[in-house]
Amino acid sequence: MDSIDLIGIVYFCSMRYRHYPLVILMAIAFQSNAQDKWDLRRCVDYALVNNISIKQTDIQARLAKIQLYQSQLSQYPGASFSTGTSYNSGRNQDPTSFSLITESYLSANMQLQTSAQIFNWYSKRNTIAANQWEFQAAMAASEKVRNDIALNIANVYLLVLLSKEQEKIAGIQLQQSQSQLGNTRKLVNAGSLPELNAAELEAQVARDSATFIMSKGTTAQNVLSLKAFMALDAATPFELDIPPVDKIPVEDIADLQPDAVYASAIANLPQQRVNDYKIKAAERNLAATKANMYPTLSAFGSLGTGYNSRANEILSATPLNAPLGKVTVGGTLYDVYPLRPFTDYTYGKQHLFSQLNQNFRQSIGLSLSVPIFNSGSLRTAYERSKLNIQNLQYQQQADNQKTKQDIYQAYNSAMVALEKFNAGKKSLETADRSYGFAQKRYNVGMLTTLELVTNQNNLFSAKLENALNQYDYVFKMKVLEFYKGKGIKL
């Protein structure tokens, strides 16, 4: 019922009878009860959110997406920073002056490195394309699992509806037997019928009670199976919205010819896309493994600097031009000076940033990597990639054959189910008429109790068989509609 209609009814009742609070509570209770029922759409939607298998396939799709993202990032240059510090004593090489010393000192080094592949025969590009197809395959696989879960839920849902219908038929049968036993017991007590008639009906009531209890157990078991597919807690209250089976829309079987359904399935079913995407991914992986067998050209560069605790720097310099001595020439005394003046230096500890600036170094270059011999690992990877493509192609053929076989089997099963359903309806009509005649004859004493029970059992069996045939036909048709790409609708 629409919310607008419900509000209108509430308003009308409140104005007509002036019991506004009571009407509101009744309306809320009615709406809540309607919402608590589970139809097929609600069951499927709940399963798509909570089913463990679906969650696992979603994780696989997310892992494939992460792998794709990582391969895309591999196109860009890599960079790393490293640093270290050490305390040295004894005879060591000064890392800044590269001279041998015997003093103890503290040193530190820092380096930034980067590298990038310039050309690798499109190995990375093919790897990215392969991961892209793998991601698409994972998404299609997730969709396939969702479709399989929906189909399984529809199957179990129909089984629950069938078991409930059989339970209803068994309950009616039990009520009829109990009513007949009550009437017969009155006639026996009045002396109109022998005790044997009542005993036979008591046995029939016992059999009908057992059948009714078994049908209730079957319904409960099917409900538990449905909850399991939905990942719904077994203790959760659960009431199905039961549509009349004759109101379930079913496409005309003439529009579900197996050849046309198979062509539609190949074009639309996610399993076919999974196979297509995996083959394309394998072809790209083959190209990537082949590229790894050729030389790779790369560029690299680095920046670095260092620090040494014993490094000194000149704080000041004083030129010295003092005479070295005296000399007498021709009786004259002269001062002797050096050809070059001396300089007196004052040293002190070199500061950190001064050292980092002074020791700053750079490098850049190219490298060529040529695979010559690697124990056949690259060739093995290449051959395995080729065989993997063939294996996936065979898997695709096998899946296509199985899909075609399943469709033809479903079509033949639907045809048989339709014929059984039509024949069952005639059998039910005949059994119903026979039971009606038997009741009339029994009421006037022209039929024994055993004969009446036999006719009643025949009618009961015909009802059960008709319900089974009807639900079986509906499910077979829903399978064909599923393969055609119509989804599951009840």
PLM feature segments, named:
Residues M1-L40, L48-N51, I488-L490:
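Bacterial Sec-dependent N-terminal signal peptides
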Residues N33-G84, G90, A234, D241-N285, ...:
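Bacterial Sec-pathway N-terminal export signals of envelope proteins
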Residues K55-I59, Q72-L73, S104, I118-R146, ...:
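Sec/SRP-type N-terminal targeting helices
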Residues I59, L73, A210-L232, K425-K486:
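Short segments within alpha-helical structural elements
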Residues Y69, Q113, N285-A288, S367:
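Outer-membrane beta-barrel architecture
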Residues S82-A116, P244-I253, F300-V370:
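Small/polar, glycine/serine/threonine/aspartate-rich low-complexity segments that form flexible
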Residues Q111-Q113, Y157, Y262, G365-S367, ...:
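Membrane-embedded beta-strand positions in outer-membrane beta-barrel channels/transporters
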Residues D148-S264, S413, A417, N458-L459, ...:
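Periplasmic alpha-helical coiled-coil/stalk elements that build and connect Gram-negative outer-membrane
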